[in-house]
Amino acid sequence: MKRSRKFPIGRYTPVISVTILVLSLISIPAFAQQTNFIASLSGQVMSPTVSTTATGTAKFNIEPDGNMAYQIDTRNLYGVIGAHISLKNGTDLAQVFNSYMEINGKSEIPTGEVNGLLSKGVITSSDLSGPLAGKTVTDLANLMKNDSVYVVVRTQGHENGEIQGVITPSNTGYTQGL
């Protein structure tokens, strides 16, 4: 009769445990990177395209509290009236700049060129609109992970948008404290 050999599990348990631990730690940075997003903004991404020298960058980061910090920088942009995160079909999901809002008791309407910081702040669940109204910032981030949303910057000369860009996952984002 043949003897069966049993696999000596006890002997390999430490090796298996360390391997599982290492593999799980490798996946954590990949998940963490999904909390950072970026969009490169230009008139070429608009539909129809807009002939402009204006450009911009929008950076987003999911903060530990579950809210989303953002910063939008632009160059050669004149008379900005608003900026939104929108679905590809144009439905607005969150406002990230509104020149007609009252700030410190007065209406702020930018004049001249914007060369640098246009807007920075934090998006909370209560800021979401359209199909995301009543949902969470995580729902917005899930759309960003799928390249399903844009940042659109509207100006007095191009009320439907002068520059825009698709928001995509990134290795770097924006942290409110910076």
Regions found by a protein language model. Name each.
Residues 2, 28-83, 87-178:
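Metal-centered catalytic cores of metalloenzymes
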Residues 15-27:
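Bacterial N-terminal signal peptides
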